[in-house]
Amino acid sequence: MENKSMKTLLKATALAGMMLTASAGAAIDDNTLQVTGTVTPASCLPALSNGGEVNFGNTISEKLTQKDNQLPPKTLTFTITCDHAAKVSLHMVDNNTVGHRLMVIKNAYHNDDDNNEAAYQFGIGKNSKGDAVGAYSVTIAGSPVVNGDATNVIVSAGGVWGYSQTHAFTNGTGVNALLSVAKPDGEIIPMAFKVLEMTLKINAAVASNTDVEMTDAIEFDGSSTIVMTYL
């Protein structure tokens, strides 16, 4: 096999030499082989219902008498549509950290546990004196759906994936917990999909009117970004 390969190489070399000699004496047709194409990664488009806006409506400050006043939970639909099957992770970044006041947010997690962890809360706004008035949390409610089938929410905070008990997003101020989805009967690793649908539950709590001055109207201005990363 080694000799045959060497002979073939020598023949090709000799032929190339003859072609060079011929081109020096007379013009010959130039026959060019072109190989074209493009390698492109899958492209995914995320979309939030209602333009990503969550409106908690009007709350009368005189009614905020508890230490942690719970606002009615809200939901948004989050969909990721890809042109080819892709694996992604999700994390969030709080754009209003100065408006965060550590609260106890009731039944915020997937397992209905309360959220009293700063890393899992986002700033909701400040009063006229610059005091933060509360916080909100963002959790994946239930099981995300791929092709009509339920999936498991998995989490990684250091390169190792495991099942998420809370389904909650961290706020990006510390170690980002990456969330993804996995097949319910397969390995605990991110799965590829073309369309992923999930419901996001947004819970919020506001401080009492004795802990924070509320003589003036307070406009909630919470803002956070969902970051999608291809895996």
Regions found by a protein language model. Name each.
Residues 19-24:
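N-terminal signal peptide c-region/cleavage motif recognized by signal peptidases
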Residues 2-8, 25-231:
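Mature extracellular/passenger domains of Gram-negative fimbrial/pilin and adhesin proteins
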Residues 9-17:
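Sec-dependent signal peptide hydrophobic core
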